[in-house]
Amino acid sequence: MKKWYLIAATLLLQMQSVPAIHNKSGNVKVCRKVISFTPPLRIPLILSGSFGELRPSHFHGGIDFKTDGKTGLPVYSIADGYVSKIFVSYGSGYMVHITHPNGYTSIYRHMIGFSPVIMNYTLNYQYRHQIDQCEITLKPNELRVRQGDQIGFSGNEGFSMGPHLHLDLYRTDNGDFVDPTPFFMSHFKDTRKPQATGIRLFPQHGTGIIGGRTDQVSFYPANGKIIKGWGWIGVGVKCHDYQDASYSQHGVRYVSLYVDGKLKCSTNMACFSRTENLMKSAWVENDFEKMYREPGNRMRIMKADPQRGLVFVNQERDYKCQLVLRDLYGNESKYNFVIRGRKQTVPQWKFSGNVLIHWNRINIISRPGVQVIIPKLMVPNDLSIHLQVHASTGLSDVYQLDNQPTLLLGSCELQIRLKHPVPQGDERKLYIASQSPMGWKSCGGIYRNGFIITKIEKLGTYKLMIDNTPPKISVLSMGAGSRLAFIVGDSGSGLRSYRGFVDGKFVLLHLRRQSNKMEYKLSEAQVKRGGIHKFELIAVDNVGNVSTYKNSFRW
């Protein structure tokens, strides 16, 4: 137990090591330096997504600006600096990193294109390497920008649910994502208080009980609610914040739990690392933010007392609890409830599954045909899972690692044995597939000594599959409207690469996730107008199957 207290104390010191003072002017004082940024858009700023908002498997790493429901708005650099990375990606569309001399790097995602200078640099790289999706790292003296220079156009590219601009801000030295909101506070109006929509009590396994039961108890946050309990009990809250000009729900910046007037636990969603971004399940369960630290929770956003924020009910009296929600503007809501101490027998915890995963040690789970190697610190606390093996006549049995998909705090290794031999050379076409609501999805994998091995981030349902089918190419346009357009898909291992050629010369087909369509706009700079041209499209999937489409068109 003492070792855990030392770890917690160290984390608290780390969290306090970079003080930041913000005010409504938008200037932020960090380590005695005053840092300011200008807006990336020239329209009134309205947030559609806040920093640290809950996503299915992670936290939102930046803020989303509404763009009036339109694409194509100019996007500007928020400060002097240089373009350090350029991405054209399936997930984020056109994306650029700008490194600033003040210690921060800004990222602009989901754009439909770059400014002419950045676009020309990108196109030269793409044509030189004959690729569409790319990641380019630049030197400080290659593409410099000034504050307010246009760098791109807002869009709806990649994993986007509507037109917006996503802005990330991270510390250049260590990569920690930082909330950009304090730098733009003067551009927002916020008089609305954060709201709680539910409170949940978590009796701890083998040491806590509520109303004679060991089940979690949820209730609407009405002041004066009384819950009878005994032993060690955790508190969680489901909450949202709002701004005046938007109906969007945002995350709450500050949450605190007080018991009998003393602070037990607090969270400040100010920054997190890429590693911490995978730790959502250590802090959040069914959208309830736990106001206590699980043993495996290493997130620095949380500060807890020596009891990890847990309420220790060991007297037959009322324990007065208060949850305080506060936003950056000082808007605050308070919710009071009582845990009434009633002595009850706490039953010994008996895990319901057939496998127990320990949070603080390496776990090796072996069953015939499968092995899972889970490093330590990959689960928040000791976790009981129910592993099932479903017999199959396929390439492997089906392995259900838990009754429902369970997120890990990182990745682990999964090995599945091949039951039936495949033709020599086809081992490279094998992959591990994960079951999802949309069907079976490839998780990749490599063949080694009769097993396929890959990394997974959740305890779901898996099996082996083989992909002998090349990508499917469907033609949408062969020169009509001065464009070449196709839909290229691969339902097995997934599409890895694609290249188009007109009269033997590479042309850039850009793939857009929203429509799953790739398109090339014919240009006289690359294709001579007038006459018949030969076109070739080559698509390759992730296990090496190749599709080739050839045709001629008049333009």
Region locations from a protein language model:
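Exoplasmic/lumenal beta-rich domain surfaces
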Residues: T105-P140, T214-G224, G251, Y258-N314, ...
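Proteolytic-maturation and junctional protease-sensitive modules
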Residues: P405-L459, S497-R499, F506-V507
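Short beta-strand elements
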Residues: N331-Q348, Y549-W555
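Proteolytic processing hotspots in large secreted/extracellular or virion-associated proteins
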Residues: Q348-W359, I385-Y431
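Surface-exposed, glycine-biased beta-strand/turn segments
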Residues: P19-S106, I112-P116, D132-N141, R146-Q147, ...
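Solvent-exposed loop/turn segments flanking beta-strands in beta-repeat/beta-sandwich domains
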Residues: D244-R253, G425-E427, G489-G504
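Surface-exposed, short loops/turns at beta-strand junctions within beta-sandwich domains
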Residues: F312-R317, I456-K458, E524-I532
